[in-house]
A protein has these predicted regions:
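A short beta-strand-turn-helix
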Residues: 2-18, 46
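Structural alpha/beta surface segment adjacent to cysteine/selenocysteine redox centers
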Residues: 16, 21-107, 112
Length: 174
């Protein structure tokens, strides 16, 4: 189901002809490098111009720990309409995250603290986070980051199949 994206995890126009899906972990060094060097160029050239819709999917590399907690924090921020500010804040830490800092990040981006704390402490989005990881595994990804290029309307076809791109690739390869 290529239309079942979480609205808070999408950048770009819904009618963009191409969708780029990233499977990533907030603690992954290569994912941080993509965020710092490739993402700004992709956003300026393709997403902001309406050519590509960008979808972020969680792929924490472990079943517990700070990577999972960061994914939960981003989803809880998304529940308050602030997914991308939390996403950017987490990646701006350069992969050096500590679970004790997430509630402070929530405050700095203007989240309602009680609702965020309840969501975070109850790990409300854990199941969907692990579903993202299973989906990445079905695409053949066993590490992060991984990307899928796919037609936005109608999904892949025999003539225009989805393209899986494993690993951190430079901007020029997109």
């Amino acid at each position: 189901d290529y239309d079942g994206f979480y609205a808070s995890e999408v950048h770009g126009r819904a009618d963009a002809p191409i969708t780029l899906i990233e499977y990533s972990d907030f603690t992954c060094g290569w994912c941080v490098k993509f965020f710092q060097t490739t993402w700004p160029r992709l956003q300026a050239k393709y997403i902001d111009t309406g050519k590509v819709r960008f979808v972020y999917r969680d792929y924490p590399r472990a079943d517990q720990g700070v990577g999972v907690e960061a994914a939960v924090a981003s989803r809880c921020a998304g529940a308050q309409g602030k997914y991308w500010p939390m996403h950017d804040r987490l990646f701006s830490q350069g992969g050096r995250l500590d679970s004790g800092l997430f509630k402070g990040y929530a405050k700095t981006i203007g989240l309602e603290q009680v609702a965020f704390a309840k969501c975070f402490d109850e790990r409300q989005y854990l199941e969907s986070i692990f579903q993202d990881r299973q989906e990445a595994n079905r695409w053949g990804f066993h590490g992060t980051p991984g990307f899928i290029l796919i037609r936005t309307v109608g999904g892949p076809t025999e003539k225009e199949p989805a393209i899986a791109i494993p690993g951190a690739v430079p901007f020029e390869d997109f």
